[in-house]
Amino acid sequence: EEWNFTQLDDILAEHAGEDLIKFLNLIDKMKTLEDYNAIQIRQDHDKATLTTKVSRETFQIDWQQTCKNIHNFVRAYSEVPAAYSILNDKEIKIIRTQMSENKSTLPIGTITDIVKNSHFSVATTDYDLHILEVKNPGKPVMSAASFINGARLKIGDSFGN
């Protein structure tokens, strides 16, 4: 549950080659598709769903979500294109997070805690979300500890749109 999309993609790619070779060997041994006992089912086009158009705003974090939803959103879009939010009028990409069981009374999207040499936390609709890695525009990914030192964060700063 802690893997992000890139890590999962790498793991699947590592094993896909072996499985593909097994599958191709199986097909090579078959005389006809009927030998495979595959059942073909036509798609019911009335039940088909289409995705929405992906835009830049698709990757913006909605802090009005639960801690788990935001954590999973960051995991899904980590690295490329990366989930992002606006902090002090600057776009910050959030690369890695961790769920917590801390609840804050501060407004949603507000920095609730700063743990030097570790992380900072942001209020969500239920629990605080620990931010572990971020990326500033044009800069490499950095730990939250490095970001805290350079950005001069303080409790009460707020992520916005």
Where are these regions (language model features)?
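An anion-binding loop in the catalytic cleft
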Residues: 58-161
